[in-house]
Regions:
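All-alpha amphipathic helical-bundle segments outside canonical DNA-binding/catalytic cores
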Residues: 84, 121-126, 142-158, 177-181
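C-terminal peripheral helix-coil segments that are non-catalytic and often amphipathic
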Residues: 2, 88-95, 131, 135-143, ...
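Hydrophobic alpha-helical connector segments
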Residues: 60, 74-100, 152-159, 180
Length: 196
C-alpha cells in the first residue's frame, strides 16, 4: 500500500514538474497534454487521474514550490541562524521563479487565487512552506533570535504576505527587476522588525 502511494505521488510529481518546465520553455498555450505525458514518461490515463485538464495544472505551482522547499530543507544546518535560513529559502525560491516560471503564469496563479471559490492553495497551512516557516520561526523564538512579542502565527503570516507582495509587484512590473536581488535587499529590513 505504501509503495502504491509513493508511486502515485512520484507520478503526479513527474507530471507537475514536467508541465512547468514545458510551460516555461514552450509557453503555456503551446504546450499540450500530449507533450506533458510524453516528456514525463507517464500516460494520458495517469494525467487525467490527477488533473481534469491542462488548466488544472495552474493551481499546482504551490506544489512545485513545496517540492523546492523539501529539496532545500537538506541544505539547512543547525549552525544557520533563523534569519539566515529564511533568507536562504527566499533567495532560492525566488531564483527558481525567475529562472523557470513564466511571469504571465505566475500572474495568472496569483489572480486566480483572488477570485477562486475553491481551495486557495497559497494559503493552505498544511503546505510544506508553512510547516517549514513555523519550525524556523519557533526555533528563532526559542533561541532568543526572534521576538516573542508577536506569535509564531503572526510572524509566519507577515512573512508569507511579504513574499506574496513581492511576487505580485514583480508580476505587475513585468519582471523589470530581479526578484531575488530585490528581495535580498528588502527582506533583511523586514525581518529586522522581528529581532529580539
Amino acid at each position: 500500500m505504501r509503495t502504491d502511494k509513493k508511486n502515485a505521488r512520484n507520478t503526479k510529481k513527474k507530471i507537475v514538474s514536467t508541465a512547468w518546465k514545458l510551460f516555461y520553455r514552450q509557453g503555456y498555450d503551446n504546450t499540450t497534454v500530449d507533450d506533458i505525458v510524453y516528456e514525463s514518461g507517464t500516460s494520458k490515463g495517469s494525467f487525467y487521474h490527477y488533473f481534469s485538464g491542462k488548466d488544472a495544472l495552474l493551481s499546482t505551482l504551490s506544489y512545485l514550490f513545496d517540492e523546492k522547499y523539501e529539496e532545500l530543507t537538506d541544505a539547512l544546518t543547525p549552525e544557520m541562524s533563523c534569519m539566515d535560513k529564511l533568507l536562504f529559502l527566499n533567495r532560492e525560491l525566488f531564483r527558481l521563479i525567475e529562472d523557470t516560471i513564466a511571469i504571465d503564469l505566475l500572474a495568472q496563479l496569483l489572480s486566480s487565487q483572488l477570485v477562486t471559490r475553491s481551495e486557495k492553495h497559497l494559503l493552505d497551512h498544511n503546505r510544506t512552506y508553512y510547516k517549514l516557516l513555523r519550525t524556523i520561526i519557533q526555533e528563532g523564538q526559542q533561541s532568543g533570535e526572534l521576538t516573542s512579542a508577536a506569535s509564531v502565527s503572526d510572524i509566519v503570516k507577515a512573512y508569507a504576505l511579504f513574499e506574496r507582495a513581492l511576487m505580485y509587484d514583480w508580476c505587475l512590473c513585468d519582471g523589470e527587476y530581479s526578484l531575488s536581488q530585490y528581495s535580498a535587499n528588502m527582506l533583511p529590513m523586514f525581518l529586522a522588525g522581528y529581532r529580539a
